[in-house]
Regions:
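Glycine-rich phosphate-binding loops of nucleotide-dependent enzymes
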Residues: 1-133
């Protein structure tokens, strides 16, 4: 198990964890997120769900997690990222789904949208956002 864990962390280019025997309690927030993602990959999951993975992280740890999310996509894994941080979303997403009051109000290709359009959808919902455009 230790060998597989070491190989998985290496395949994700996670270099900030000194030892797989290191206690999770001693890891930074970014390292903990990396371990959580590696655990999903280790069990051959093809979809990884990340709920606010950069919340409460510092700049360096946020960078580490976003880079990891990009590497997952490059390795062919689907990543579902829940975030309120639009700059994080636009950095790593291919497609953006906007939920408002628990309902899907739109799916946007990142290459065909911008932050303003997403904010309008979040604020007003799809129909209102289209009317105000």
């Amino acid at each position: 198990m230790e060998q597989r864990t070491t190989e998985t962390l290496a395949s994700l280019s996670v270099t900030t964890i000194r030892s797989v025997r290191q206690l999770v309690a001693t890891l930074s927030g970014g390292q903990r997120q990396s371990v959580a993602v590696a655990r999903a990959v280790l069990w051959n999951n093809r979809v990884v769900f990340l709920d606010e993975p950069t919340a409460a992280l510092g700049v360096a740890q946020t960078r580490q997690v976003l880079d990891l999310v990009k590497r997952l996509g490059e390795q062919g894994l689907a990543v579902v990222l829940v975030s309120h941080n639009l700059s994080d979303v636009f950095e790593v997403a291919d497609r953006i789904t906007v939920l408002r009051l628990g309902r899907n109000v739109g799916v946007y290709e990142k290459s065909a949208t911008n932050e303003q359009e997403i904010v309008q959808a979040i604020t007003f919902g799809e129909q209102e956002a289209e009317a105000s455009a």
